């Protein structure tokens, strides 16, 4: 009789314990829903102006090059619309053919860079981007004398103010780093793809302002000194006090 009562009490205790554990198990299996964190970064985060050094070096050590400056807008530390303007120049002579080529003309590019860093507010940035570029230019082509292979004799050749234009795309990969205060340095590598062109009646132009030596595709690069106003600062978290 006593054993039956003990067994009855043990059964009730086990049943009560199982019933008490059931809600805990159900709660443990329910995933916790975390509140969605809103992006409180301001849309406009700053603007930067820059100048390319590579073109200046080309002008100093070769017969062609360019002066180039750019302006870049910072949107949410993620998107960077860019406009690039420059002046391309060439004054070259081929030693073998004695052909001289000369041009000076402006060019422009517009496009967008994306910040590829995991932490988009980092003071250093990794970019991927795209540019559309265009130039309309005139060039002079001359030679002191061209020998006729059939009849012999030499005739001068001069073509002045030959009109041409180029449309092309540039695929961009680059980095820039904060040096001090608003001063930054940036590097980019560019793959250029010609879309459409008109070289005038004399054939392919030797040099195209902004594009470089003519051809279907080419690689290029820039090294920029950048002055940036705004951006590159971690946004304050909600409830964080300002520094005194």
Question: Where in this protein do the model-derived segments appear?
Answer:
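Short glycine/proline- and aromatic-enriched beta-strand/turn motifs that initiate or cap beta-hairpins
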Residues: 27-74, 224-235
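Short loop/turn motifs that connect adjacent beta-strands in outer-membrane beta-barrel proteins
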Residues: 33-45, 78, 117-125, 179-185, ...
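Flexible, solvent-exposed coil segments and beta strand-coil junctions
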Residues: 45-51, 86-95, 147-155, 201-206
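Gram-negative (and chloroplast) outer-membrane scaffold detector with strong preference
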Residues: 79, 84-151, 227
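Outer-membrane beta-barrel transmembrane domain signature
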Residues: 127, 131-220, 224-234
């Amino acid at each position: 009789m006593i054993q039956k009562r003990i067994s009855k009490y043990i059964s009730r205790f086990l049943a009560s314990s199982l019933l008490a554990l059931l809600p805990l198990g159900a709660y443990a299996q329910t995933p916790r829903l975390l509140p969605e964190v809103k992006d409180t970064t301001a849309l406009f985060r700053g603007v930067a102006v820059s100048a390319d050094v590579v073109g200046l070096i080309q002008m100093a050590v070769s017969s062609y090059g360019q002066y180039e400056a750019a302006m870049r807008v910072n949107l949410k530390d993620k998107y960077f619309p860019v406009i690039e303007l420059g002046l391309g120049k060439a004054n070259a002579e081929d030693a073998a053919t004695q052909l001289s080529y000369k041009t000076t003309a402006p060019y422009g590019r517009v496009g967008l860079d994306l910040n590829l860093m995991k932490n988009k507010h980092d003071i250093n940035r990794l970019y991927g981007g795209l540019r559309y570029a265009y130039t309309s230019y005139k060039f002079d082509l001359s030679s002191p004398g061209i020998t006729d292979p059939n009849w012999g004799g030499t005739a001068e050749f001069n073509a002045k103010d030959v009109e041409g234009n180029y449309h092309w795309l540039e695929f961009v990969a680059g980095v820039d780093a904060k040096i001090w205060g608003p001063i930054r340095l940036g590097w980019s590598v560019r793959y250029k793809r010609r879309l459409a062109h008109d070289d005038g009646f004399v054939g392919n132009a030797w040099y195209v302002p902004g594009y470089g030596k003519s051809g279907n595709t080419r690689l290029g690069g820039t090294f920029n000194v950048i002055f940036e106003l705004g951006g590159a600062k971690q946004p304050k978290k909600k409830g964080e006090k300002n520094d005194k």
